[in-house]
């Protein structure tokens, strides 16, 4: 969610913990360890916790080409201004945040959507909340699939979305209890997790998914921002949206940013071949 934000602590805690009615998203609620189900889902890293020995998870994302990692714009827009560098990516399903020199961290160049922003004309309706990390070296992982243009609109027209299952993956905070409010949210532990969701609503730039435990759904929380939402069950690799926002309790709804729109595809097309 727009839930990753001292300065990275303030910025990441600001970028990640802007928990209002529409707060950025973090970790998976009521989920389970992903293992190798979604090897192309990764975590965005930076050394932002003063007493931590190595780089820390602050957002999630997805490999969408051999060397292109997609995440959310609110995860990266403040990095240069706050002097947060370097930024890395890991695809380790159980990243060790307590290691001084963790293995497998990939370096790269961050590019935030030039029109990113939640203010100004059309800001909330289409914030262009996207960014990519152009990896210096490909990880040798088969990327996730991207959707065709307008796929979700087509599914909405024939009512397929109403019965569709979605899978969310991320490295964020964890909720395992249905009660307890914010106190029921556990800290990031470096484990990639997944869970399933159902459809709630579709807007021109947004796909809102249920994470109501009362209806058997679950979803994203702090630190899952930028992470993938796949159309289909736990074996699906068809990426249709990314985690951007949700509710402060991480148990009502995920508001995700669509990547099948002409607007999103215009940005993505600068870095990958689109279907």
Positions of predicted regions on the chain:
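Chymotrypsin/trypsin-fold serine protease catalytic domain
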Residues: 126-130, 134-217, 255, 261-269
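Short, solvent-exposed aromatic-acidic interface loops
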Residues: 111-116, 211-218, 243-248
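Solvent-exposed loop/turn segments at secondary-structure junctions
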Residues: 48, 68-70, 75-77, 117-118, ...
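C-terminal subregion of chymotrypsin/trypsin-like serine protease catalytic domains
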Residues: 28, 34-40, 56-77, 83-95, ...
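Secretory targeting and sorting signals
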Residues: 1-27
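Conserved catalytic-core segment of clan PA serine endopeptidases
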Residues: 28-37, 77, 82-153, 187
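Hydrophobic residues in beta-strands and at strand termini
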Residues: 44, 63, 71, 91, ...
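A generic structural motif
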Residues: 45-50, 92-94, 169, 230-232
């Amino acid at each position: 969610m727009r839930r990753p934000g001292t300065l990275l602590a303030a910025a990441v805690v600001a970028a990640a913990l802007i928990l209002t009615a529409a707060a950025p998203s973090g970790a998976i609620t009521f989920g389970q360890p992903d293992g190798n189900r979604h090897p192309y889902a990764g975590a965005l890293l930076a050394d932002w916790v003063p007493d931590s020995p190595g780089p820390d998870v602050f957002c999630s994302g997805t490999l969408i080409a051999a060397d292109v990692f997609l995440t959310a714009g609110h995860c990266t827009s403040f990095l240069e201004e706050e002097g947060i560098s370097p930024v890395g990516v890991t695809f380790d399903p159980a990243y060790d945040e307590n290691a001084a020199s963790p293995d497998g961290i990939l370096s790269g160049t961050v590019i935030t959507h030039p029109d990113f922003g939640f203010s100004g004309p059309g800001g909330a309706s289409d914030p262009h909340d996207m960014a990519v990390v152009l990896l210096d070296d490909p990880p040798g992982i088969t990327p996730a699939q991207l959707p065709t243009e307008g796929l979700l609109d087509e599914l909405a027209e024939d009512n397929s979305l109403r019965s569709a299952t979605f899978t969310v993956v991320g490295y964020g905070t964890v909720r395992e209890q249905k009660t307890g409010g914010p106190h029921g949210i556990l800290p990031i532990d470096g484990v990639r997790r997944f869970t399933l969701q159902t459809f709630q609503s579709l807007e021109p730039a947004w796909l809102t998914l249920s994470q109501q435990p009362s209806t058997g759904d679950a979803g994203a929380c702090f630190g899952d921002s930028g992470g993938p939402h796949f159309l289909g069950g736990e074996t699906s690799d068809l990426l249709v949206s990314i985690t951007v926002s949700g509710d402060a309790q991480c148990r009502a709804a995920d508001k995700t940013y669509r990547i099948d729109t002409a607007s999103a595809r215009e940005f993505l097309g600068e870095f990958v071949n689109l279907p």
